[in-house]
């Protein structure tokens, strides 16, 4: 029986790298995958995942209006060799899209591997993450570390000088130049780096 997996972590833990490796593993065995990326993440263009270590892969762009179950059903009808669905930046999914992913596992018997962060720079949950945490069959934490050596669980937004930003829009695209993964203590203290 297929399952809905949610791989979650703070930023910069290697979620996209893990996703691309999973897709590669299927492809190496002669099985096709569908890889989706919400359009809101256009740092590398709408249809490409790019990792910090230089790996990249093509994706299918998702908008908030994409009927995910229909899209996957149609692709499966065209190519019955599709064996897995993968979603990067899954925190940007809508509730109905997470429902659709659950339906894909239940009705189409395809495993779904979703990768994302749980919370934003204010410690508030993303819509997609809320429902993945509630409905996924398996929750898998991908660990990364804070500058102090503790497990990083939070995402601290920083300005050009490295100062913490506590207010603003929930979504502001950026990587290492705009966000740093911290433990809860250093998130609360607003310390993106080790103080002397």
Curated annotation (Swiss-Prot):
Name the residues that bind ATP: 9-16, 88-91
4Fe-4S recorded as keyword: no
| Pfam families tied to this protein | TK
Give this protein's Gene Ontology molecular function annotations. Answer: ATP binding; thymidine kinase activity; zinc ion binding
User: What is an annotated GO biological process for this record, any one?
Assistant: thymidine metabolic process
Superkingdom of this entry's organism?
Bacteria
Question: Where is the protein localized?
Answer: Cytoplasm
Where does it sit, as one GO cellular component term?
Answer: cytosol
Is Aminoacyl-tRNA synthetase a UniProt keyword of this protein?
no
Q: Which residues bind Zn(2+)?
A: 146, 148, 183, 186
Instruction: Name the UniProt key words of this record, in alphabetical order.
Output: ATP-binding, Cytoplasm, DNA synthesis, Kinase, Metal-binding, Nucleotide-binding, Transferase, Zinc
Predominant place of localization: cytoplasm
- The record's active-site residues are 89 (proton acceptor)
Q: What is its EC number?
A: 2.7.1.21
PROSITE patterns assigned to the protein according to its UniProt record, in alphabetical order: TK_CELLULAR_TYPE
InterPro entries xref list:
P-loop_NTPase, Thymidine_kinase, Thymidine_kinase_CS
- Reactions performed catalytically: thymidine + ATP = dTMP + ADP + H(+)
HAMAP family listed in its UniProt record: Thymidine_kinase
**Which protein family is it in?**
Belongs to the thymidine kinase family.
NCBIfam families hit by this protein: PRK04296.1-5
PANTHER family this protein is in? THYMIDINE KINASE, THYMIDINE KINASE, CYTOSOLIC
This chain belongs to which protein, by name? Answer: Thymidine kinase
């Amino acid at each position: 029986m297929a399952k809905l997996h949610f791989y979650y972590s703070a930023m910069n833990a290697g979620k996209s790298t893990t996703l691309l490796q999973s897709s590669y593993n299927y492809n190496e065995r002669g099985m096709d995958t569908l890889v989706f990326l919400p359009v809101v993440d256009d740092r590398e263009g709408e249809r490409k995942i790019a990792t910090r270590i230089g790996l990249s892969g093509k994706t299918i762009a998702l908008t908030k209006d994409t009927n995910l179950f229909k899209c996957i059903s149609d692709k499966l009808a065209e190519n019955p060799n599709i064996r897995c669905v993968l979603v990067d930046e899954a925190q940007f999914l809508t509730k109905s899209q997470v429902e659709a992913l659950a339906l894909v596992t239940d009705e189409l018997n395809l495993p779904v591997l979703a990768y994302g962060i749980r919370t934003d720079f204010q410690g508030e949950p993303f819509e997609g993450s809320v429902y993945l945490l509630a409905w996924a069959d398996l929750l898998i934490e991908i660990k990364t570390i804070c500058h102090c050596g503790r497990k990083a669980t939070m995402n601290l937004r920083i300005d050009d000088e490295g100062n913490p930003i506590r207010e603003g829009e929930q979504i502001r695209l950026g990587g290492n130049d705009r966000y740093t993964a911290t433990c809860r203590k250093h998130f609360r203290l607003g310390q993106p780096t080790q103080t002397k």
